[in-house]
C-alpha cells in the first residue's frame, strides 16, 4: 500500500517522494489503471505521472484521467498530470499561423502525426493554455502538473536544428527586449548569447504565471518545471552521439539545491536509451546512476517509461525499484537533507559567453570537478546564473571557497557579490580568463591581478612550456618538480603591488629533435597569484589547469590545483574520506546527522555505465567531533566500527549511505 499520509498534506511535495511516469501512446487508452497503480506502489513510488489520452473510445468510462485518479488515491498515491503544449494539429496551425514556430527560412516545424510546433512567445502559450488548464483544474482534482517540452524549439525530436524562431511575436518581444538589435538566426550570430537570456526569461515568466494559475485553483497541487515552479525538474537521459559526462545528474541537482535547499528537485530518469530508440532499454547500471546521483544530493527519484508497465521489457526497472524503495525506506534521512560542503565550483552559463568560450569553460570546469571528486574533497555545484541570487538569499555565506573555472567576463552584479563575499572572509580561486572583461581589465578587486597583458591560446606556442617550483639549478638543466605543462590557454597578467604567489614559468624551449630538447629557463612569471582582500583571499591561476587535467589526464594538474585549494582556500570540512578515486562522495546533513553518499562509478564507459568492481579498504576520518562518533551504513543496515575517530567502511558494492552522529 502507498503512503496515506502523503494524501493528507497540503503541500505534500515538500516531503520526499518517488514518482513513476507512464508516457502513454494511443494504443494505451485501455490501460488497466488498478494494475498500474499496484505496479507503481510495488515499485516504491508515491506518485504517478500520467498523460491524457485522446483515444478514450476503448474505455467504458470514457475518462482515463478520472479512472487513474480514483485508482491512485485508493492506493495512497498522488496523481500528476503530464501536459504538452509544444505542438498543435496541422488544422489548428493553418488557422493560427501566428501561434507557430517560424524558422529563419520561413518554414514551420512539423512532426510525425501531422503536428506543428508552436512558439512560447505566441498567444497559444501566452493565453490559450490557461483556458485548457482551467478546464483540467475544474474537472480533475489532480495533485500536480508537469508541462513537457517548454522550449523555444530550436531542435526537434530528430535532433535537427531549425534555428531561432522568427515569428512576429518573437520579433516584437525581441525588439523591446534588445532595444532594436537584429534577432539572431542561430548560434553563430552576434546576438545569440543575449537571445538565450531573452528566451530563458520568456520561459521563466510563463512558468511563474502557470504556477500562480494552478495554485489559485488547486492549492495543494504542485507544478514541476523550471526556476519559477514549485519543483525543479531535470530529465536524466542518454543520447546517441553525446559524450558521456558521468556526473551530469549530481551536478544538476546540486546546482539547484545549493541555490535554494528548501525547493524540491525531481529527476525524471529515462528507461530507454534515447528518443529515437524508445523500446531499447537503458543499461541497468547506467540507469542506477541517475537515481543514486539524484538522491545523493537530496533530489526526488522518478522513473520514466513508455506505455503500460509490462508491455515493453525495460531491463532497468528492477534496479530502479530497488533504489526507489531504498529512498522511501529511509525517507526520514532524506526529509530535510541539506548541502554542507564548504567549497563551491561554479558551473558555466552558456548565456554569458560564446559557444567557443563555453566549450573551453566547460572543459576547465569538468577537469576541476574530476580533480576534487577523485580526491573526495566535498564540494557543491553553483550555477553561474544564480550567483547574485545566492548572495541575496545568503546562500554564498555557507561556502568558504568558491572556484571560477575560466568564466571570462562576469556580470556586474556577480562581480560585486563575489567581492563582498571575499571581503567578509571568503576565499576565491579564479582560473585563466575568469573575471577579465573585454578590454583586459580584471573586474574583481579581490583578485591579485590588475589587468591581462596578453593571452596565448595557440597550441604550438604553448608546447614545451611549464610551471614548476622555483628552480635553483635550472641553468644547469637540472629541475625540481612537480613540473606542470601548459595546455589550453595562458593569460599573462600584470599583478598588483604587495601580492604574492607561487611557482615560476619554465620558458619555451626546443622539444625536437630529441638531441635539441633542452633549454627551459626559469622566468619571473607566476604559476598563481595571491592577495588579501578584507578578511578573505583571492587567488588567480593564470592558465587552464582544469582543462589540462581533463584533456591530458596528468596527475600534476590535479595535484597543483588541489594543493592550492587546500593551502590557500583551506575549507574546514568535518570529514576526510580515503577510498578509491572511482567513488563519488557527496556530503549533506540532516540536523546534527552528517549523511555521506558513496557511489561506485568504476563501471563508467564511453557512452554509459556497465558492471562495477567492488571496492574495499575505505575509511572516513572524522576531523571535527566528539568521542562518541557512531556510523550507520543504511544499505547494509548495520552499525560500523569506529576506531579513534576513523570509520571503517564495508566493501562498497554499487552504493552506500553512511549516517554519522555524535559530533
Regions found by a protein language model. Name each.
Residues 25-42, 125-136, 250-253, 283-291, ...:
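Short, acidic/polar
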Residues 49-54, 83-90, 146-157, 226-229, ...:
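Short, solvent-exposed turn/loop segments enriched in Gly/Ser/Thr/Pro and often Arg
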Residues 19, 40, 72, 129, ...:
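Conserved, mostly hydrophobic/aromatic
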Residues 1-39, 87, 333:
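N-terminal carbohydrate-binding accessory modules
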Residues 65, 81, 85-140, 149, ...:
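Active-site-adjacent "subsite" loops/lids of carbohydrate-active enzymes
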Residues 32-55, 291, 371, 375:
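Catalytic domains of carbohydrate-active enzymes, especially glycoside hydrolases
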Residues 52-88:
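Aromatic-lined substrate-binding rim segments of carbohydrate-active enzymes
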Residues 2-9, 14-17, 79, 185-663:
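Carbohydrate-binding surfaces of carbohydrate-active enzymes
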Amino acid at each position: 500500500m502507498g503512503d496515506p499520509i502523503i494524501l493528507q498534506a497540503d503541500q505534500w511535495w515538500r516531503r520526499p517522494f518517488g514518482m513513476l511516469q507512464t508516457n502513454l501512446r494511443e494504443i494505451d487508452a485501455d490501460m488497466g489503471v488498478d494494475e498500474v497503480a499496484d505496479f507503481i506502489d510495488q515499485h516504491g513510488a508515491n506518485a504517478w505521472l500520467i498523460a491524457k489520452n485522446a483515444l478514450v473510445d476503448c474505455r467504458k468510462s470514457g475518462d482515463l484521467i478520472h479512472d487513474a485518479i480514483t485508482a491512485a488515491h485508493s492506493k495512497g498515491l498522488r496523481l500528476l498530470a503530464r501536459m504538452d503544449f509544444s505542438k498543435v494539429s496541422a488544422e489548428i496551425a493553418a488557422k493560427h499561423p501566428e501561434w507557430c514556430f517560424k524558422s529563419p527560412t520561413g518554414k514551420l516545424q512539423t512532426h510525425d502525426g501531422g503536428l506543428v510546433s508552436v512558439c512560447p512567445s505566441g498567444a497559444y502559450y501566452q493565453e490559450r493554455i490557461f483556458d485548457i488548464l482551467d478546464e483540467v483544474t475544474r474537472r480533475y482534482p489532480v495533485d500536480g502538473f508537469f508541462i513537457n517540452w517548454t522550449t523555444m524549439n530550436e531542435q526537434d525530436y530528430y535532433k535537427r536544428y531549425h534555428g531561432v524562431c522568427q515569428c512576429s511575436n518573437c520579433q516584437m518581444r525581441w525588439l523591446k527586449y534588445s532595444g532594436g538589435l537584429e534577432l539572431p538566426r542561430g548560434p553563430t550570430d552576434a546576438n545569440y548569447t543575449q537571445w538565450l537570456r531573452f528566451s530563458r526569461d520568456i520561459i521563466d515568466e510563463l512558468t511563474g504565471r502557470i504556477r500562480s494559475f494552478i495554485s489559485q485553483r488547486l492549492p495543494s497541487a504542485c507544478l514541476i518545471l523550471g526556476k519559477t515552479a514549485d519543483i525543479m525538474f531535470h530529465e536524466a537521459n542518454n543520447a546517441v552521439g553525446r559524450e558521456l559526462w558521468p556526473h551530469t545528474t549530481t551536478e544538476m541537482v546540486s546546482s539547484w539545491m545549493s541555490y535554494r535547499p528548501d525547493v524540491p528537485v525531481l529527476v525524471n530518469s529515462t528507461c530507454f536509451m534515447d528518443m529515437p530508440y524508445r523500446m531499447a532499454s537503458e543499461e541497468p547500471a547506467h540507469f542506477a546512476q541517475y537515481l543514486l546521483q539524484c538522491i545523493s544530493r537530496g533530489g526526488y527519484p522518478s522513473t520514466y517509461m513508455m506505455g503500460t508497465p509490462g508491455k515493453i521489457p525495460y531491463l532497468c526497472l528492477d534496479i530502479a525499484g530497488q533504489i526507489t524503495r531504498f529512498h522511501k525506506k529511509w525517507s526520514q534521512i532524506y526529509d530535510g537533507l541539506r548541502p554542507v560542503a564548504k567549497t563551491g565550483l561554479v558551473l558555466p552559463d552558456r548565456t554569458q559567453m560564446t559557444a567557443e568560450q563555453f566549450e573551453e569553460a566547460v572543459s576547465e570546469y569538468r577537469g576541476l570537478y574530476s580533480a576534487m571528486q577523485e580526491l573526495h574533497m566535498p564540494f557543491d555545484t553553483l550555477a553561474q546564473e544564480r550567483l547574485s541570487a545566492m548572495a541575496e538569499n545568503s546562500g554564498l555565506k555557507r561556502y568558504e571557497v568558491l572556484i571560477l573555472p575560466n568564466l571570462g567576463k562576469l556580470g556586474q552584479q556577480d562581480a560585486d557579490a563575489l567581492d563582498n563575499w571575499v571581503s567578509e572572509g571568503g576565499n576565491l580561486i579564479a582560473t585563466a580568463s575568469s573575471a577579465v572583461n573585454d578590454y583586459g581589465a580584471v573586474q574583481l578587486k579581490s583578485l591579485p591581478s590588475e589587468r591581462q597583458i596578453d593571452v596565448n591560446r595557440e597550441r604550438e606556442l604553448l608546447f614545451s612550456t611549464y610551471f614548476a617550483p622555483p628552480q635553483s639549478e635550472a641553468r644547469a638543466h637540472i629541475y625540481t618538480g612537480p613540473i606542470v605543462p601548459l595546455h589550453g590557454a595562458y593569460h599573462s597578467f600584470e599583478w598588483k603591488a604587495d601580492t604574492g604567489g607561487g611557482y615560476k614559468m619554465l620558458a619555451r624551449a626546443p622539444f625536437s629533435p630529441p638531441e635539441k630538447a633542452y633549454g627551459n629557463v626559469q622566468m619571473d612569471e607566476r604559476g598563481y597569484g595571491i592577495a588579501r582582500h578584507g578578511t578573505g583571499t583571492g587567488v588567480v591561476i593564470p592558465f587552464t589547469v582544469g582543462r589540462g587535467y581533463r584533456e591530458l589526464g596528468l596527475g600534476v594538474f590535479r595535484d597543483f590545483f588541489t594543493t592550492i585549494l587546500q593551502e590557500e582556500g583551506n575549507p574546514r570540512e568535518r570529514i576526510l574520506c580515503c577510498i578509491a578515486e572511482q567513488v563519488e562522495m557527496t556530503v549533506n546533513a540532516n540536523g546534527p546527522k552528517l549523511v555521506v553518499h558513496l557511489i561506485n562509478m568504476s563501471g563508467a564507459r564511453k557512452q554509459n555505465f556497465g558492471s562495477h568492481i567492488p571496492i574495499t579498504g575505505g575509511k572516513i576520518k572524522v576531523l571535527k567531533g566528539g568521542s562518541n562518533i557512531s556510523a550507520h551504513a543504511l544499505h547494509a543496515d548495520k552499525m560500523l566500527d569506529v576506531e579513534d575517530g576513523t570509520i571503517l567502511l564495508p566493501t562498497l558494492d554499487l552504493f552506500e549511505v553512511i549516517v554519522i552522529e555524535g559530533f
